[in-house]
Amino acid sequence: SSFCRKKLKCVIVFLCPFLWLFGLHGSAMVNGLVSPVLQANSLANAEILASGQELTVANGGHIVTQQFLDQFMTVTGAGLTLGAVFFMTVFAKSKKYRELGNLALLPAFFNINESIIFSTPIVMNPMMAVPFIFAPVVSGLITYSALYFGFVPLFTAVQVPWTTPPILSGFLVGGVPAAILQGIVLSISFFIYFPFLKKIDSANCKKERQRSEERRVGKECRSRWSP
């Protein structure tokens, strides 16, 4: 039913990043709950297409499928953290976040982001919880709308491994429109993370300067009192 589909979408959009905030592997836990339904939806879409009908919502096509989760809700990792990684790599001023961004950049392109989740940290961090949950919500709304109104074709049984890099994975499951949509939601994720990361990066810069000053004073004291 329509009500059940809406509940399923809410579970996917909210529960996955929410569990990660407490250090639980939200992606694995949510996948275990919803993957049978999502894959059944993908197969149902394939059957509609195989029957010679146009694959549309009006003809009974499903929007929320395994590809919806893997290629749009958790692309580059739970929370769509490529936007955060890009900020750290390009715009961060603190040594900690520049190094973390450089370390996390390559894994992010294979949808692996534990280094960002645990080292930023996002886990148990109320400030970072906001963009971490909000980015998938925005992605979900945009993707759902694009599929509903036919800007992107509904997904069929074509699936790719979850480690397939973004843009390529979108192209493989939904052609050029899906690849473009991935680029759009990932670009938006950068702007969602930007103000929050800018604030914690500035705070970390101050801490680094304080530690540097403390070390400098300590060295001066030791040299002054050394025989």
Q: What does each model-identified segment do?
A:
Residues 82, 94-104:
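Membrane-proximal intracellular helices of multi-pass ion channels
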Residues 71-76, 106-107, 119:
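Short, surface-exposed loop/turn motifs that are enriched in glycine and acidic residues
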Residues 46-65, 83-85, 103, 116-216:
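Transmembrane alpha-helical segments and their short flanking loops
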Residues 7-10, 97, 130:
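Short, surface-exposed helix-loop/turn micro-motifs enriched in polar/charged residues
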Residues 213-214, 218-227:
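Positively charged, low-complexity/disordered segments
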Residues 1-91:
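Generic multipass alpha-helical transmembrane bundles of integral membrane proteins
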Residues 16-17, 105-107:
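Contiguous, well-ordered alpha-helical segments that form the cores/surfaces of helical PPI scaffolds
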